[in-house]
Amino acid sequence: MKNLRLCLLSAVAIMAALTLSSCNNKEQMKDSPAAGTPRAIIHTNYGDMTVEFWPDVAPRTVDNFIKLSREKFYDGSAFHRVIKGFMIQGGCPNSKVGARGAPGTGGPGYMVKGEFNNRAHVKGVLSMARASDPDSAGSQFFVCHGDASFLNNKYTAFGKLVSGEEVLNKIANIRCVGMEGSTPTERVEITSIELVEAK
């Protein structure tokens, strides 16, 4: 009887260990790109940044970003708002040379419903900018330059930087002016966005 009890306890312990191992593998795989996971290379006059999208948590947002990139909507726009240690923001058509309207006030002419999720806003995370209305995102996006956990579950995180952190740092270190101290003194232009697939 005693031996049977020990065997049962051993079996339970092994099952628990396997379950934990399985859970850990799932957690690790969650951050690994699946075959064909879409990526984009944001080409700028400061260098390239490659981002990997998260269609599993923000499908509409990812589709919208890809659509606008294919339409060359972002080409010639700029990172018009830069706050070191917080984020760099771009994607506004009003930031293009010769455009009417103030940078930061433009969009594609429609809004995308928010897809708030459990992905943390940490350095390198790609997220959508918006107005006070949670469903007012359009084309403007930002790349976190530091921890911005106060944005978690309030802004749509939809991807992360997988290369080009040195470019992010270079842009974030540009001297800025203005009331908020976020207007770059040098133009950081998005020359194009190239869509690729993870291998």
Where are these regions (language model features)?
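Cyclophilin-like peptidyl-prolyl cis-trans isomerases
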Residues: 4-10, 18-199
